[in-house]
Every structure is written in C-alpha cells, then in structure tokens.
C-alpha cells in the first residue's frame, strides 16, 4: 500500500493510516476463513446449508449490535488501544476455531470473532476523520476498501493452499497467530502519538442528538444493501463454485483470488479518482453519491448474470466485473459517513451505521441457506441478492438526504 500524505506530513500518522488499511485486510482474512474451509468443514461436522448459514450468521449476532456501543467508546476513550484489544480477541478466536468439534463450539467462536472485529470500522473511520483532510479521504478510505478486497483475495489464496495440502484446521491456527503480529507495529507507532492512552478531549456529542439524525439512519439502510451483496459473495461463492459448477478447491481458490485482486486494485484507482475530482472543484457530495450508486448497480448486475453463467470463462469474467464494480462502494460508504459526522462524531456515527448495515449479516446467510435447502439451487438466492443491490443503488441516488456535515451542537 502506498504512503498517504496527511495534514501535518507526519510519518507516524502516515504509518498509522497504512496500518488501519492492513488491519482491515487481516479482518477480512480471518472473517472469510470459514468460507474457504466450508467445503471440507461442512462435511466433517455434518452441517446442512441452513446450519452452516446459522454458524456464519453467529458472527453478526454480536458484531452488528455491539457497534452501537463500540462507536461511542471510540469517540470517548483511546481509539488506538480499543483497536488493539479488538484485534487480540478476534485473533485468538480465529486460532481456537481450528480446534472445534461441532456446531456449538463453532457458533461460540464466531460470536467472539464478531466481538473483536466490531471495533475495526468505527475505530478506523475515527482515526481517518481525525488525521486526514477531506480532499485526501478518498485515498485513505481506499486503503480500507482495498483491505476488504485483498483480505479475501490473499486469504483465499493462502487459505485454499493450506487447506488443500494440510486441511482446514491448520489454516485457522496459522491465520490466528499471523494476525497477532500486527500488534507489534501498531503499538510501536500509536504510542508515540500525544493522544495515545488518554481519554478523548474533543467536545462530546450527545447520543440523543446523534440518534435523531435522519441521515444516519438513511446511511444505515444503504449500508445494509451493500453488505448483503458483499457477504453473499464472501460466504457462498466458494460453495457455489464447488457444488454447482464442480470446481476443485484449487480452481475455486484461483477464481476467487483473481476477482478479489481486481477489486483491490480498482479500490486504489477509484480512491485516487474521487480525490482528483474533488480537488478539481467538483462537488464532493455529488462525486461520492454517484460513485456508490453506480457501484451497487454494477454489483447487482454482476450477481444477476452469475446466476445464468455456465462456462468457466463467463464466471471468471463476471467475478472480475463484480470486483471492479464493488470497489468504489466501501470507499464512498465511509467517506460519506465521515462527511456527515465530522471528526468528533465519526466513531459513534460509523458505529450506528455499521451496526444497522451489518444486520444483513445476521439474516442474509440464514435466508440464503434456507433458499438453497428448499430449492436445491443457488439461482433464487442470486436473484434476491441482485435485487437488494439494485434497491441500494436507487436508495443512495434518491433516498439518502443532502450530504453535508450535520449540526450536532
């Protein structure tokens, strides 16, 4: 990841922003590990599609609702330490997943994984809003967006390779231990900042005032549509390729990796492009609204066409199209939220928005699993997901109110 210039040209802050991008990468490596293991794990633990969907959704039972509180904590206490504690919890949960013996232990560890990972986006957005000027936030947020894509890309490549040669349990052990090493550069970098270890001295925003903002709930609804599509691909793509199209684990790994690499590369491009347009004098609100609406439309179209694809070439082309189309989504999703909230309320705002948006992670996997078990096909699940993405495109185009910093005093 390239170094981003920041307001004070401070190397420590530049390193901090890079580490925020990298922690999102680790977040998605560990979150997506269950999908890589799924073809073998489901058989070994004798899980139906519905029970597997239940295990996947368990991550969100805590991940989504706890963010209402986590965002508030990031605005009031040391956000740098909060992120470190969250990572330690999820890394240990990932490691211990390699020892599970059934559905119950899998569900429990998925819950703790969700608890640890819940800190990532409220903390990351708080740090970006605090340290990065508005005309550079497209690129700063592209680091997080690239992590969302490159985590599954390299995680699928590494995890698929480990699983193919050694089984799915060693994959969880290796991923969990590797994630813990992030704490070393993070603590060495963050502890040099004046704000490290102290309570936040910024003026507080009353929770009631924040919760009465229609724009925040509108963003939460839009966020729901983005995550519904993203988690559908992240969770079910490996099973879809293996079960519906007869791919081997190695073939599935290759196709998924190429798609996610395309998404990661496109994230850097769209982050740079959005900042360039803003610096050239275009309305930042119009740029970011247009990009996210177009992104959701592209995601929906790609998912719809995947339901009808039959040849490996067509599937790969559509997966790459999905990846490139999805890239602007996360960049602008968080950049718009940072515009609405401003630096002092960014943690709380993202916490509420992320919590609302990630409710899709609770219901989506269960709905998808039930559809697959009932129809013995992925077709209807793909159609439903495409429709949700299409609705999201319309919502961001016409449903989200005027994008500007709201009055919170």
Regions found by a protein language model. Give the residues of each.
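Conserved MFS/SLC helix-loop-helix module at the cytosolic interface between two early adjacent transmembrane helices
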Residues: 65-104
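Extracytoplasmic
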Residues: 15-49, 233-238
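Helix-loop-helix hairpin linking two adjacent transmembrane segments in secondary transporters
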Residues: 144-188
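Juxtamembrane intracellular "pre-TM" segments in multi-pass secondary transporters
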Residues: 2-10, 193-220
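Extracytoplasmic gate region of multi-pass secondary transporters
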Residues: 34-35, 214-270, 330, 334
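Helix-breaking motifs and short loop linkers at transmembrane-helix boundaries and internal kinks
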Residues: 46, 78, 99-105, 133, ...
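Cytoplasmic helix-loop-helix junction between adjacent transmembrane helices
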Residues: 109-149
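C-terminal ends and interior cores of transmembrane alpha-helices
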Residues: 88-101, 294-310
């Amino acid at each position: 990841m390239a170094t981003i210039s920041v307001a004070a040209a401070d190397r420590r802050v530049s390193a901090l922003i890079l580490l925020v991008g990298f922690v999102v990468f680790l977040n998605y490596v560990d979150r997506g590990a269950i999908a890589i293991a799924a073809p073998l794990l489901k058989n070994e633990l004798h899980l139906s599609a519905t029970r597997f969907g239940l295990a996947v959704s368990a991550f969100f039972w805590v991940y989504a609702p706890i963010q209402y509180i986590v965002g508030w904590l990031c605005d009031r206490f040391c956000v740098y330490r909060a992120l470190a504690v969250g990572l330690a919890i999820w890394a240990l949960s990932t490691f211990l997943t390699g020892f599970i013996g059934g559905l119950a232990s899998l569900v429990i560890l998925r819950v703790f994984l969700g608890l640890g990972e819940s800190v990532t986006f409220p903390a990351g957005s708080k740090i970006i809003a605090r340290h990065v000027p508005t005309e550079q936030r497209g690129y700063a947020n592209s680091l997080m967006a690239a992590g969302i894509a490159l985590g599954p890309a390299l995680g699928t490549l590494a995890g698929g390779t480990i699983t193919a040669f050694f089984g799915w349990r060693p994959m969880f052990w290796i991923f969990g231990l590797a994630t813990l090493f992030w704490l070393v550069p993070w603590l060495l970098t963050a502890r040099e900042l004046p704000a490290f270890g102290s309570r936040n001295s910024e003026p507080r925003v009353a929770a009631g005032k924040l919760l009465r903002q229609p724009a925040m709930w509108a963003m939460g609804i839009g966020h729901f549509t983005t995550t519904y599509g993203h988690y559908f691909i992240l969770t079910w793509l490996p099973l879809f390729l293996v079960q519906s199209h007869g791919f081997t684990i190695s073939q599935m790994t290759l196709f998924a990796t190429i798609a996610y690499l395309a998404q990661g590369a496109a994230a850097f491009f769209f982050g740079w492009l959005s900042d360039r347009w803003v610096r050239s004098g275009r309305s930042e609100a119009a740029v970011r609204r247009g990009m996210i609406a177009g992104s959701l439309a592209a995601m929906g179209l790609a998912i719809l066409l995947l339901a009808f694809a039959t040849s490996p070439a067509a599937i790969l082309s559509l997966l790459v199209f999905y990846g490139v189309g999805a890239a602007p989504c996360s960049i602008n999703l968080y950049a718009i939220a940072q515009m609405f909230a401003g630096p002092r309320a960014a943690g709380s705002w993202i916490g509420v928005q992320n919590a609302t948006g990630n409710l899709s992670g609770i219901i989506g996997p269960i709905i998808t699993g039930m559809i697959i078990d009932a129809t013995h096909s992925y077709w209807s699940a793909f159609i439903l997901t495409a429709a949700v993405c299409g609705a999201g495109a319309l919502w961001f185009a016409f449903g989200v109110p005027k994008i500007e910093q709201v009055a919170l005093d």
